[in-house]
UniProtKB/Swiss-Prot annotation:
One Pfam family hit: NAD_binding_3
Gene: nadX
Record-linked InterPro entries: Asp/hSer_DH_NAD-bd, Asp_DH, Asp_DH_prok, L-Asp_DH, NAD(P)-bd_dom_sf
Protein's job: Specifically catalyzes the NAD or NADP-dependent dehydrogenation of L-aspartate to iminoaspartate.
Catalysed reaction equations from the record: L-aspartate + NADP(+) + H2O = oxaloacetate + NH4(+) + NADPH + H(+); L-aspartate + NAD(+) + H2O = oxaloacetate + NH4(+) + NADH + H(+)
Identification of the protein by name: L-aspartate dehydrogenase
Additional remark text: The iminoaspartate product is unstable in aqueous solution and can decompose to oxaloacetate and ammonia.
Molecular function (Gene Ontology), one example: aspartate dehydrogenase activity
Length: 267
């Protein structure tokens, strides 16, 4: 049985707990949240993981097999780095955090010191395996276009530049490289960062972001070209009802990763 501690109990964390509540190979031992959120977390996890303890941090003598981060960028510094130092493998959802200078290097260093591994999850996007494989032979271009309903861009710089509620046609709110996209839109940066880390890097991955009132889905389009040939991928992801900035596929990617760790056969 795989013993798991999870950082975060928001829309992603609760979705993961619900989908794995009947899996005999996965046991959630702890859910890690800020102190002010502990009571709410206890209530949220009760139907899915009633035996999991709610705590503010992973103890130094924790016997967990795996830490799963579902809490946002700050959780990498606060929880993932210490867990790696303790020798605990980690799964990371908030891949966009690695666009910040030095974060990727610190994660790798902590994992090496603890003889652990950190796995960056694909989240809302597919074909990461193909892109990473294509990089071995040489990539010429990786172009990502992200299209979301205007409401998904609330509380971002787009809200200062555009009247999102008044948009009547697809509108480009950003075009540039993945590093700049991640800096300006950190809560929407995970897909661009994941593609960059699998492919050409943050500086050389081209990103276009659109607010589109004609769609009610999060639409991701990836084009890659290189020595292998080329591919295009379009994904139309339904957002989580509890968080329109997040694709439901992100939850499913966590569930799949845990299953691959826990089950006898993985794919």
């Amino acid at each position: 049985m795989l013993h798991v501690s999870m950082v975060g109990c928001g829309a992603i964390g609760q979705g993961v707990l619900e989908l794995l509540k009947s899996d005999p190979d996965v046991c959630f031992d702890a859910v890690i949240v800020p102190e002010h959120a502990m009571d709410k977390a206890r209530e949220a996890i009760a139907p899915f993981a009633p035996n999991a303890r709610v705590t503010t941090h992973l103890s130094a003598d924790a016997h967990t097999d795996l830490l799963v981060e579902c809490a946002g960028h700050d959780a990498l510094e606060e929880h993932v780095l210490p867990a790696l130092e303790q020798g605990i493998d980690c799964l990371v959802v908030s891949v966009g955090a690695l666009s910040q200078p030095g974060v990727a290097e610190r994660l790798e260093a902590a994992a090496r010191r603890g003889n652990a591994q950190v796995q960056l999850l694909s989240g809302a996007i597919g074909a990461i395996d193909a892109l990473a494989a294509a990089r071995v032979g040489g990539l010429d271009a990786v172009i990502y276009t992200g299209r979301k309903p205007p409401r998904a861009w609330k509380d971002t710089p787009a809200e200062q530049q555009f009247d999102l509620d008044a948009l009547r046609e697809p509108t480009v709110i950003f075009e540039g490289n993945a590093r700049e996209a991640a800096r300006l839109f950190p809560k929407n940066a995970n897909v661009a960062a994941t593609l960059s880390l699998a492919g050409l890097g943050l500086e050389h991955t081209h990103v276009k972001l659109l607010a589109d009132p004609t769609v009610d889905e999060n639409i991701h389009h990836v084009e890659a070209r290189g020595a292998f040939g080329g591919f295009e991928l379009t994904m139309r992801g339904k957002p989580l009802a509890a968080n329109p900035k997040t694709s439901a596929l992100t939850v499913f990617s966590v569930v799949r990763a845990l299953g691959n760790r826990a089950h006898a056969v993985s794919i």
